[in-house]
């Protein structure tokens, strides 16, 4: 028996062996690597480039890639299926992580943290499961603007570095739940 083992071992070393490659599984794994995530519009309004946001932190993409929306209404809905991972106490910003791992920050207005939550309301909490179109936050757009604040709303993919590409597929007016970004 030991002789059979030694002979088999020597023949394997001498001639090698080939693993059978399951072409179907190999193809399936490649498809999974190329998985895309659609991110839908969280607001109704006009889409603009982050470079057009009059705030250097957003315009420079220091926090990540994304887009901004000049809202026409005061409601923010979930752009993905996922989980609420952060809500600022002032309700001016919310973080969501999609089921595919895309981390999204929606920042309602510029310098609106200074309003200390005035004009904002929300019925969701950190840890809540959300679906595309679920209402996240409402805000009084007109009152915020009357206080002198810009309501332009950046939507940032904070873990942009983890993705090959983030493409905006809509460049003008958007409605709630319009497909807006494709992330690969």
Feature roles, as predicted:
Residues 3-184:
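Contiguous, well-folded functional domains in the mature portion of proteins
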